[in-house]
Structure formats: structure tokens, C-alpha cells
Regions:
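Extracytoplasmic low-complexity repetitive segments enriched in small/polar residues
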Residues: 40-42, 68, 142
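Active-site acidic/histidine proton-transfer and metal-coordination neighborhood
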Residues: 50, 58-59, 79, 86, ...
Length: 284
């Protein structure tokens, strides 16, 4: 076995031993954004998701790669069920939700049991004017998805957090979309933009239905981009999600892989750090 395989095996054993206890005692549920392991799922989709389940994740958020199940969502649902994984959500583009494709897209995700469809990024999110226009499109989609038992959401990068708190593009989107729509805060990008992710959960209660736990650093600071080895107040953030976020899913996401670590190894390390935080908090 190579070094990365050995590291995964060690982390899987440690995390797996505690996974049932953590899953039973914690809320929100814990998932992983599959973009974090995009190279590994291209090489072995089923094997990688099986390993994700063994680490103790309760769900996966899709980002457009469905391996051999691209045209067979029912079989993918069976595979997820077999591995006790839920669909925590999916990142989809506006083009996939255009009128001509809406029914096919929503039917695919409903088969997976996926209720949360999130726009991962849009160039209009870089400005107040663009975000105002985009909010109208998000609001229209919210109305179309609600009868299907689904929600639309939007995911931030640093561009949506530019400007003064209260007048950022993120604030504009929050104020101009229905309360049922998801403000999927990416904690890493919020931090990287110099804003407080905890404050934003409290600012828009009930809107953080899912959120990305990603370790990044505020301007002028550095560190290791792994949950628990960084500077983020993960306990305070989790407390806010439980108190006011109406949060269903904490979704671990990795886009940086330090010290030559593999993608799945890094995800496992962040999950280990997250579970260490949760273990010190009151169960809920």
C-alpha cells in the first residue's frame, strides 16, 4: 500500500469507530461536497463514495459528476441507500433550471431524494446591481420548485462578501429572495473575504439550510487549510447553526490539499477535526 492508502485506512478506522455515535448525537447531519474529491471519483466513483460512507459521512452533495449513473438516477439512489448515504443537495447551474430543462433536472434530483438545489456561482454575484437582477431569477425558481418539495439556493465566494456588511451582494441576495430559499454560506470564502461567518448566520436566521465548512484564512493570516487546524471558530459557528440557522446539513468541502495529501485523505482529516469539535459540544 502507498502512503496515502495507509493514511486513509488509519483515518477510516478511527472515524468509523465513532461514526454511529456522532451521527446519532449531532444535528445538523454531516455531508461532503463531492467537488472535494473530484479527481478520485473520476477514477473510481463507486469506490470513492463507499470510502466516504465508511468515514462516517451521512450524505453527499453532488457537483455534476454521477459516475456510471449519469442516466440512471434510480440506480444511483439504490447505491446511495446501500451505503447509507443521503443526497445532501446538489450544485446546479441556472442553465439546468431553465424552462426547457427544469422538469428533467428536477425529476433526476427528486429520484435521488435531493430537495436542495444550489447555484454554485454566478458572475452577477460580484456586484450589487447584478445580484439584484439575479435575485429575481432566484425568486422565480423558488416559486417553481416549491410545489415539487424542493428549494433553490445560492452559494457564496469572496465576491459576494465584498463591501460593507449590510450592503454586500450577499446581503442584497438575502433581502431580495424568499425566506424559503437557501443562503448556502461557504464559511471559508466568507472568512477569506474578511467577514464573520457566525455573524451572518445570526443576521439571516432560518436561511442557512446547508453550509460549507471549509478552512480558509482571513487576509494577512495563514495556516493549514484543514478543519480544526485553522483559526475558524467552528464551535461558535455550529452553535449558531443549531440556534437560528434551521440547518439540515453541514457540508465539508476541500479545495486545498496541504503537504502532498490526497483528496480523500484531506477530507478525512477535516472530518476528524470537525468531529473533535462536535465531541466537546452538548449533544443535539
Amino acid at each position: 500500500m502507498n502512503k496515502q492508502t495507509v493514511l486513509y485506512a488509519v483515518l477510516a478506522a478511527a472515524l468509523g469507530a465513532a461514526s454511529h455515535t456522532v451521527a446519532a448525537e449531532t444535528s445538523p447531519r454531516i455531508g461532503v461536497q463531492l467537488w472535494s474529491v473530484k479527481d478520485e471519483i473520476k477514477q473510481d466513483f463507486e469506490g470513492t463514495l463507499t470510502k466516504i460512507a465508511r468515514l462516517g459521512f451521512q450524505g453527499v452533495e453532488f457537483a455534476g459528476d454521477f459516475g456510471p449513473y449519469k442516466s440512471n438516477p434510480a440506480a444511483l439512489r439504490s447505491f446511495l441507500d446501500k451505503n447509507k448515504l443521503q443526497c445532501a443537495g446538489a450544485h446546479v447551474g441556472f442553465d439546468q433550471l431553465a424552462d426547457a430543462r427544469l422538469e428533467a433536472t428536477t425529476a433526476f434530483y427528486k429520484t435521488l431524494g435531493c430537495a436542495n438545489l444550489v447555484i454554485p456561482m454566478d458572475a452577477r454575484g460580484a456586484s450589487v446591481e447584478g445580484s439584484t437582477a439575479m435575485s429575481k431569477e432566484l425568486s422565480a425558481l423558488s416559486s417553481k420548485l416549491a410545489p415539487k418539495g424542493m428549494r433553490i439556493g445560492y452559494h457564496n465566494h469572496a465576491q459576494e462578501m465584498a463591501g460593507e456588511v449590510g450592503s454586500t451582494p450577499w446581503d442584497v441576495i438575502a433581502r431580495n429572495t424568499p425566506k424559503a430559499s437557501i443562503m448556502q454560506q461557504d464559511v471559508g470564502w466568507t472568512t477569506h473575504a474578511g467577514k464573520d461567518p457566525v455573524a451572518y448566520v445570526y443576521k439571516y436566521p432560518g436561511r442557512t439550510v446547508s453550509t460549507h465548512y471549509k478552512a480558509k484564512f482571513a487576509p494577512g493570516t495563514t495556516g493549514t487549510p484543514i478543519i480544526g487546524q485553522d483559526r475558524t471558530d467552528w464551535a461558535g459557528l455550529t452553535r449558531a447553526l443549531r440556534e437560528v440557522g434551521a440547518t439540515q446539513w453541514i457540508i465539508v468541502e476541500q479545495e486545498e490539499y496541504p503537504n502532498g495529501m490526497g483528496q480523500l485523505d484531506t477530507v478525512a482529516a477535516s472530518l476528524k477535526g470537525l468531529k473533535a469539535v462536535l465531541a466537546k459540544m452538548p449533544a443535539k
